[in-house]
């Protein structure tokens, strides 16, 4: 078992996640079994209760983990399924250690950061790496952050625990480009490596993020001052698409270098399919715009997996998918139709997607967007809350009901959306929703079954509310097709409309299972329908 630790320096949001994911892809392309771990130094147990404005998307795993969005990149790049345990947080570590202390597991010893916290960190990493050839562990944050210190100490000890031949340290750092001087500056990276060495970690490989190519002179300088071999100074310049990064890093020799340093048999990586995907992304034949009607559009990372799923579907259809970010609150006015008409007339809206979310802010704008898509025959995909908004819209404007969700109005006359029965008595917020993968049975000859190519589907979920079963019949009687149900026949999983270009919604989050090489069928269908005139 081999372990690769990826740290970051100078600034955050540098691309450690994409670098780690890209390396995972290169190693998997060499036939190695790869696992991925993200360490987040915040005190939450998981990402489930964090604001999308602060942390971006909550990525849900099959086993119901509410995790950091980087796990989504790992799954997409490496094409693997991860679990809740693949996201380690400070909160999880301290919770576990303190629980053991209360049970008396430490036999009266003084519980300290070293060795108890660091041992807990190491044990989790080792347990997760048991079934893999290589485990890549990304350390969140930046070297120098006080929150990261216990994790950095733990990974420092790792080399001694498992043998230096089984451990590799990769440091991702920024080379700022001073445009007025036309120069890349190495000093911030030198200081970052110095700080890392002060903790006791000597990087084996330096991955340098930059806007422009790195000269041989700069590589020589970094090799000298950071005490790494010149061939271990890897250029990682800005790419045209994140999916081009593995190809750029392979060209720089990162995959070969890693296998050599870990004494693994190197082989020519099979990146044929990956190159074809990147080529289709970079050289599209068509171009469309999908409007995402959201509540958290100020931070685009809130919809990371949706953006990527649209990109995957676009590549499959040789189409560039532009995104028009539409603030749902702006569609709550009476002139919402005028706003959307102008976008359609200007060729800036070919399809509409209403994503998930929580709370009543901007809900009527989402409902109006659904109504516009339904009445104007605009391709539409609703996800989670988006499906609930589609049901509310249909109940109001087709069934003639004064309908709403009890999430937004507890006294609504017609609660077409209501709590899942099991959720009624739940009081705690964290980790208590209907989470993870659940199966659905699709109606034969429905749009859903046609898209999936089967009457069985499994998707990941994150919700407390459902389409109220008491209203299923009146909705169906008025033309709404409930085309997917939970196996027990109680919970509506998919809805759709007949005689519409493309109108489908799901209670699930299909975006989490889309891959560059396997676009999700619901997104593929949306893009395909939006291309057609």
Curated annotation (Swiss-Prot):
EC number, UniProt record: 6.3.4.2
Note: CTPSs have evolved a hybrid strategy for distinguishing between UTP and CTP. The overlapping regions of the product feedback inhibitory and substrate sites recognize a common feature in both compounds, the triphosphate moiety. To differentiate isosteric substrate and product pyrimidine rings, an additional pocket far from the expected kinase/ligase catalytic site, specifically recognizes the cytosine and ribose portions of the product inhibitor.
Residues that hold Mg(2+) according to the record: 70, 138
Keyword Cell inner membrane: no
Similarity comment: Belongs to the CTP synthase family.
Residues annotated for UTP binding in this entry: 12, 185-190, 221
Assembly: Homotetramer.
Gene3D superfamilies: 3.40.50.880, P-loop containing nucleotide triphosphate hydrolases
Active site: 384 (nucleophile), 509, 511
Residues holding ATP: 13-18, 70, 237-239
GO molecular function, a single term: CTP synthase activity
NCBIfam families named in the record: PRK05380.1, PyrG
Domain of life: Archaea
Binding site residues for CTP: 12, 145-147, 185-190, 221
Sequence ranges assigned to domain Glutamine amidotransferase type-1 in this UniProt record: 289-533
A cellular component annotation (GO) from this entry: cytosol
Reaction it catalyzes: UTP + L-glutamine + ATP + H2O = CTP + L-glutamate + ADP + phosphate + 2 H(+); L-glutamine + H2O = L-glutamate + NH4(+); UTP + NH4(+) + ATP = CTP + ADP + phosphate + 2 H(+)
Activity regulation comment: Allosterically activated by GTP, when glutamine is the substrate; GTP has no effect on the reaction when ammonia is the substrate. The allosteric effector GTP functions by stabilizing the protein conformation that binds the tetrahedral intermediate(s) formed during glutamine hydrolysis. Inhibited by the product CTP, via allosteric rather than competitive inhibition.
Keywords: ATP-binding, Glutamine amidotransferase, Ligase, Magnesium, Metal-binding, Nucleotide-binding, Pyrimidine biosynthesis
GO BP field: 'de novo' CTP biosynthetic process; pyrimidine nucleobase biosynthetic process
Keyword Magnesium: yes
Residues reported to bind L-glutamine: 357, 385-388, 407, 464
Protein name: CTP synthase
Lineage, broadest ranks: Archaea, Methanobacteriati, Methanobacteriota, Methanomada group, Methanococci
